[in-house]
Swiss-Prot record:
Monomer. Its main location: secreted. PANTHER family: OVOINHIBITOR-RELATED, SERINE PROTEASE INHIBITOR. This is Chymotrypsin inhibitor. Inhibits chymotrypsin. It is found in: Secreted. The record marks L24, V25 as: Reactive bond. It comes from Cairina moschata. The lineage of its organism: Eukaryota, Metazoa, Chordata, Craniata, Vertebrata. Disulfide bonds join C13-C44, C22-C41, C30-C62. Pfam families: Kazal_1. InterPro entries: Kazal_dom, Kazal_dom_sf. GO terms for cellular component: extracellular region. One of its GO terms (molecular function) is serine-type endopeptidase inhibitor activity. Residues 7-64 form the Kazal-like domain.
């Protein structure tokens, strides 16, 4: 789901993230926290653990700054 205005995408967090049972799929995404996650589900798990509003900055690995 794309946010209007800032271009950041909200991760789609389903049951698997709630159960902490993410698939072993390597489709990296870059979170707004600056971390690269192996897939969207793992970003969701981190989002739930930290209770932060982590969104998807871009598909693929985060760029080194």
């Amino acid at each position: 789901e794309l946010d209007e205005g800032n271009g950041l995408r909200r991760p789609v967090c389903g049951e698997m993230a709630e159960l902490l049972a993410c698939p072993l799929v390597n489709l990296p995404v870059c979170g707004t926290d600056g971390n690269t996650y192996a897939n969207e589900c793992l970003l969701c798990v981190q989002k739930m653990k930290t209770r932060q509003d982590i969104r998807i900055l871009n598909n693929g690995r985060c760029r080194d700054t």
